[in-house]
């Protein structure tokens, strides 16, 4: 009987521990939302940590990389921002905001020709989206 009680207590504690660790376990999308909120409130270091956590949870989280690129620009880490925005574009070449942000990063770096090419890609993609949206309006 004592062994059964001991096993039951051990099992209960183990189960509670597993449940509690899952309660504090955020998914990648939640980290991105957290990063956005931190950014809105001007807590850029916390935002960066949240975006990095999102990417760690899901290395294919496009919005995690996009947010991280924005933070890197604010920190004047333009090479890192460029890499982050290029990661977004590699995963989704139609992400027009990433093309714009990459152009902005290039402009900050003094790479005018690269900036203009990125802005042109942004304009083409945005124009296509606007055209599609206008056709869908009744």
Give names to the regions the model predicted:
Residues 26-57:
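Alpha-helical segment of the N-proximal tetratricopeptide repeat
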Residues 41-53, 75-87, 109-126:
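Structural signature of tandem alpha-helical TPR/SEL1-like repeats
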């Amino acid at each position: 009987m004592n062994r059964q009680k001991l096993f039951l207590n051990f099992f209960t504690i183990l189960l509670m521990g597993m449940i509690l660790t899952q309660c504090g376990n955020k998914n990648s999308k939640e980290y991105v939302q957290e990063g956005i909120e931190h950014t809105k409130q001007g807590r850029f270091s916390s935002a960066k940590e949240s975006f990095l956590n999102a990417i760690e949870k899901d290395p294919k989280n496009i919005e995690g990389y996009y947010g991280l690129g924005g933070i890197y620009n604010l920190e004047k880490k333009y090479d890192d921002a460029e890499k982050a925005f290029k990661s977004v574009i590699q995963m989704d070449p139609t992400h027009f905001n990433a093309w714009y942000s990459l152009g902005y990063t290039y402009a900050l770096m003094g790479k005018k020709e690269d900036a203009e090419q990125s802005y042109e890609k942004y304009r083409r993609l945005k124009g296509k989206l606007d055209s599609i949206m206008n056709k869908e309006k009744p």
